[in-house]
Amino acid sequence: MRLSRYFMPVLKEDPKEAQIVSHRLMLRAGMIKQQAAGIYSWLPLGYKVLRRIEQIVHEEQARAGHIAMLMPTLQSADLWRESGRYDDYGEEMLRIKDRHKRDLLYGPTNEEMITDIFRSHVNSYKDLPLTLYHVQWKFRDEIRPRFGVMRGREFLMKDGYNFDLTKEDALHAYNRHLVSYLRTYERMGLQAIPMRADGGPIGGDYTHEFLVLAETGESEVFYDSEITDLKFGDRRIDYDDVAQCRAVLEEFTSRYARTDETHDAALFEQIPKERRRVARGIEVGQIFYFGTKYSEPMGATVVGPDGSRVPVHMGSHGIGVSRLLGAIIEASHDDRGIIWPEGVTPFHVGIVNLKQGDASTDGACEALYAELKAQGLDALYDDRDERAGAKFATMDLVGLPWRITVGPRGLAANKVELTSRRTGESVEMSPQEAVVRLREIYQPVFDAAK
């Protein structure tokens, strides 16, 4: 993409309304525009990152054997009355009447609707296990929306639901989701720690929240520092292997890690003092096992092996897709701007032309741009007639992991400069070598999607 033709309304000054880093940088980089309290338009740069995150979510859900679908944003209030949850959400739930005076609501979650779909079409235990998910916009009428996309009223969320014949099968689904989420977050360049949590209005016998450590986090967290040394890495997982999924869950949850809601001071004190940590965290996902909480009142049953009807065991699993952008920025930035991890960056590399209008630099940039594209690399080419300092400032603000700088002095020796946004280190090499090096850097990102 040529920057001269791109819509990226960058701001020079910090917006006064932004209280935290991610909100400030997303506004300054032209990623979002506020339309109402807690409601945002996603401008091209922000939308591009949002879609990269969503794509990783879809890939990892497919890898775990989960099936994508799409449910509407508006739901019938009758389903929520049937489950007994219609009043639980209070004023957070946006209630609507259509022209026929029927009660509708803008869904904050989808347990009722997915249970209704299941009971309408699944009748036998032979159709189990089943896990369905979708990625859809949600609305919760927060009393005090703030912090940009971190605590908005409208947000994009992946929510999935498993249906199993027995508690044992449902707990395997729980473990499978925990493993899948660990891999999902790591691909995004995040370390999201699974922590024992409270079920809230969704309920559940077992639940873990995934939190990213950040000073601006809304939750106080208590954990054993050894957990931050754990990495999912490139391990291969057979999601049908009960023992393997259970082993990964135990590896990542056996050490103490809890939110303030479930914190046990006595247990925490048993950890060696040098390993005790108290910090703040941003919730980016949560998984639940809630047994027959919804299936029993809503009649979601199947014919079991003995011919009798039994309620299915269920769980739900959510990832805050739009919130993840804020969490990534909170975890990865400096005083000049965003530092995107390679897995979610809107563009793989930026090209800066130091002498726009010069035949040699223009030609070299065009050739470099074409070759990067041929190698499957998405480049943002700053071809504007601007000062070099302004171009560097824009690239630093936007936070692409790599920058190629092209100038007449370097080209005289067939050299360009490849710079890491994270470390600031620069290396001179030929344009061809820069393309090869970038392809090597991004190959693990491409491989992870396979």
Swiss-Prot record:
Reaction(s) catalysed by this chain's protein: tRNA(Pro) + L-proline + ATP = L-prolyl-tRNA(Pro) + AMP + diphosphate
* Localization in the cell: Cytoplasm
Its chief place of residence is cytoplasm
Q: Which GO terms describe its biological process?
A: prolyl-tRNA aminoacylation
Record SUPFAM superfamilies: Class II aaRS ABD-related, Class II aaRS and biotin synthetases
Q: Which UniProt keywords apply?
A: Aminoacyl-tRNA synthetase, ATP-binding, Cytoplasm, Ligase, Nucleotide-binding, Protein biosynthesis
**A Pfam match:** tRNA-synt_2b
In terms of Gene3D superfamilies, this protein maps to:
Anticodon-binding domain, Bira Bifunctional Protein, Domain 2
What InterPro entries does the database record attribute to this sequence? Answer: aa-tRNA-synt_IIb, aa-tRNA-synth_II, aa-tRNA-synth_II/BPL/LPL, Anticodon-bd, Anticodon-bd_dom_sf, Pro-tRNA-ligase_IIa, Pro-tRNA-synth_IIa_bac-type, Pro-tRNA_synthetase
Q: What class of enzyme is it?
A: ligase
Q: Does the keyword Cell division apply?
A: no
Report the EC code(s) recorded for this entry: 6.1.1.15
Q: Drop me one GO molecular function for this one.
A: ATP binding
A single GO cellular-component term from the record reads:
cytosol
Q: What does this protein do?
A: Catalyzes the attachment of proline to tRNA(Pro) in a two-step reaction: proline is first activated by ATP to form Pro-AMP and then transferred to the acceptor end of tRNA(Pro).
Record text on subunit structure and interactions: Homodimer.
PANTHER family registered for this protein in UniProt: MITOCHONDRIAL RIBOSOME PROTEIN L39/PROLYL-TRNA LIGASE FAMILY MEMBER, PROLINE--TRNA LIGASE
The record's similarity note reads: Belongs to the class-II aminoacyl-tRNA synthetase family. ProS type 2 subfamily.
In its UniProt entry, what is this protein called? Proline--tRNA ligase
Q: Which organism is it from?
A: Paracoccus denitrificans (strain Pd 1222)
- Gene name, per UniProt, is proS
